[in-house]
Regions:
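N-terminal cap/leader regions of alpha/beta-hydrolase-fold enzymes
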Residues: 1-273
Length: 273
């Protein structure tokens, strides 16, 4: 925004903020800490510096001030309404998207399909073929346990499921149950058993001896654990495995932002909650 240069007040705010940001970063780099503690300090100080950016406050944001004037105060009123909505409907956390326009089955996850299997941990969806002929071997999709099955079937224009169907594949997708406190003992072995059940059902429905599998994120970790177990047992039910956004080597965790927060204490705290 030109105001950062033309307005003496905003120019002073900007320069003060940048100088303070550099000072914080320099201090973290110089203080006597081991590498993991330094990584944590960088992360936390970065969050603090970003949170206190002048643009996060109305009077420190020239673009917001201009919009306030141009709209006759409507932008401020709209922001206050969003704030109240977040307080009432989102636990006080800022909403990242407006979820009101999205309705599952209406304009989200619209690919026709049916649940062909259900147990305490998941449902298995078989999607309706869109081609006259289909490949015998089905594809079983294992989505993340912390996401929805329709992350791969958002809209007709943004749907891996619809693309696979158009290529003649028989597509099955796991829909994980949202666990509650009473399900806290569900572990990796339980989720691997669920993947095995999904594969068995897909084979039974299609008459195929094996499947191709795609695992995404934590679903990819589960798929790999399933693949390793099947290989150890000499099973040939898994023909191919495709992984998406899936980290398998925990040794690289220290090189990530979240990796700096991994300690015995934080792991135990996560398990308790």
């Amino acid at each position: 925004d030109p105001a950062w240069k033309s307005s003496p007040l905003h120019r002073a705010i900007l320069q003060s903020y940048l100088a303070w940001s550099d000072a914080v970063s320099s201090y973290v780099d110089k203080v006597d800490l081991d590498e993991q503690d330094r990584a944590r300090a960088r992360l936390l100080s970065g969050i603090l510096v970003d949170a206190l950016a002048p643009t996060n406050a109305l009077f420190g944001n020239p673009a917001a001030l201009k919009k306030l004037v141009d709209t006759g105060g409507e932008s401020l009123w709209s922001g206050l309404k969003n704030y109240v909505t977040d307080l009432v409907e989102n636990g006080g956390m800022p909403s990242q998207v407006d979820s009101r326009p999205f309705k599952v089955g209406k304009n989200l996850a619209t690919t026709p399909g049916a649940v062909v299997f259900r147990d305490k941990m998941f449902e298995l969806i078989q999607y309706k073929p869109t081609t006259a002929e289909v490949w015998r071997r089905p594809i079983v999709i294992t989505p993340p346990q912390i996401n929805k099955f329709y992350s791969l079937d958002l809209t007709p224009e943004k749907s891996l499921v619809q693309f696979l169907l158009s290529e003649g594949f028989q597509v099955f997708c796991i829909s994980w149950r949202n666990p509650k406190p009473e399900h806290r003992d569900w572990g990796l072995e339980d989720y691997v058993d669920s993947v095995a059940n999904a594969v068995d059902v897909a084979c039974k429905v299609t008459g195929s001896d094996d499947v191709s599998m795609m695992g995404a994120c934590s679903g990819g970790i589960t798929s790999c654990a399933y693949a390793a177990r099947e290989a150890a047992r000499g099973s040939s039910k898994l023909k191919t495995l495709t992984l998406a956004v899936c980290t398998l080597d925990p040794a690289t965790a220290d090189e990530t932002t979240l990796g700096s927060l991994i300690t015995p204490f934080t792991i135990e705290a996560a398990r308790e909650h």
